[in-house]
Amino acid sequence: AYSHLAASEDMNEKEFTENQIKTFIAFQEKINKTFSHKVIYHQCNTSGILNYAHAQFDMVRCGIGMYGFANDVKLQQYLTPIMTLKSVISQLHTLQIGESLGYNRGYIADHITRTATIPVGHADGINRIYGKGKGFVFINGKKASIIGNVCMDMILVDVTEISCQEGDEVIVFDKTHTAETLAESAGTISYELITSMAHRIK
């Protein structure tokens, strides 16, 4: 038998969460009186495990925590992100002032812009919300903003100030440049980014 803590990551909702736990315990007591066999109980997700240890019962559901994310800056220090998504620069190109790139001319150069094409797009889980300067990748240790719209199979980034060449490694996220940080840049959460990763990614 199981339930779910609706706001276990938000300590401003501690009273609500504690009431959920009390309700679940009362439910357990009724169930235990009804059945002669042992019933297994679980209620905690990752945030519940970290914030409400007394509610771990028989099992826990460590979802995002298995990827190394805590949903809490204070608790994040105890976890290490384990996922890395990387690609390579497939093409370099220089845009002149007034030239554009991508769907719907999503980026129009107002200065001479050197761009890198990266073969990863929304079919791989990099949502369109990361386009137009919100999202970014890292090339040779430097941050490169995604410009224009995210395409199905590629993104384009500004490498005007980055020394790089075709074939260079591109870090979309890793232990240092985390999925959490990338997700926050577009106003979303790491859950959405990580669970959007397509099967074709190796």
Model-assigned labels for residue ranges:
Residues Y2-V88, L95-Q96:
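Active-site loop/helix belt of alpha/beta enzymes
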Residues S87-I89, A144-S145:
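Small-residue-enriched segments and motifs
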Residues T94-K202:
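C-terminal accessory subdomain/extension
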